[in-house]
Swiss-Prot record:
InterPro entries: Hydgase_Ni_incorp_HypA/HybF_CS (IPR020538), HypA/HybF (IPR000688). It holds the Pfam family HypA. Involved in the maturation of [NiFe] hydrogenases. Required for nickel insertion into the metal center of the hydrogenase. This is Hydrogenase maturation factor HypA. The lineage of its organism: Archaea, Methanobacteriati, Methanobacteriota, Methanomada group, Methanobacteria. Zn(2+) binds at residues 73, 75, 95, 98. GO terms for molecular function: nickel cation binding; zinc ion binding. Belongs to the HypA/HybF family. It comes from Methanothermobacter thermautotrophicus (strain ATCC 29096 / DSM 1053 / JCM 10044 / NBRC 100330 / Delta H). Keywords: Metal-binding, Nickel, Zinc. One of its GO terms (biological process) is protein maturation. Ni(2+) binds at residue 2. The keyword Ion transport does not apply.
Length: 122
């Protein structure tokens, strides 16, 4: 259950950024979660709600954006590998054009706080 540690890191990151910007309240947080992280967005959202209780984050809206896997293959294919082509227990990715495994993953591994909307002190 690596969702708990990731949710904790997200909460700490957001609280730190909010405090550095003199926030009195965090209104909204947008988080990008790559498909290759194998993080469950519903579990992340639940844990974010639980971990934010009693903090400046309590009551904030969490927007979780799932980032699809994008590759650059040696065959020349550049694009998204559809989610239904992934085995969620042991992700094996292959190029949809040539079936090969020699490629660079451009997106889908990230777990980033993309945006934080705060209310500042008057």
């Amino acid at each position: 259950m690596h969702e708990l540690s990731m949710a904790d890191a997200i909460v700490r990151t957001v609280i730190d950024a909010a405090e550095k910007n003199d926030a009195v309240e965090v209104l909204e947080v947008t988080v990008e979660i790559g498909q290759l992280t194998l993080l469950n967005p519903e579990q992340i959202e639940f844990m974010l709600d639980v971990l934010s209780e009693g903090t400046i984050l309590e009551g904030a809206r969490f927007n979780l954006e799932v980032v699809p896997v994008e590759i650059e293959c040696e065959c020349g294919y550049e694009g998204v590998v559809e989610a239904d082509e992934l085995d969620h227990f042991a992700p094996v990715i292959k190029c949809p054009a040539c079936g090969g495994h020699e490629f660079h993953v451009r997106a889908g591994r990230e777990c980033n706080v993309k945006n934080i909307k705060i209310e500042k002190k008057d």
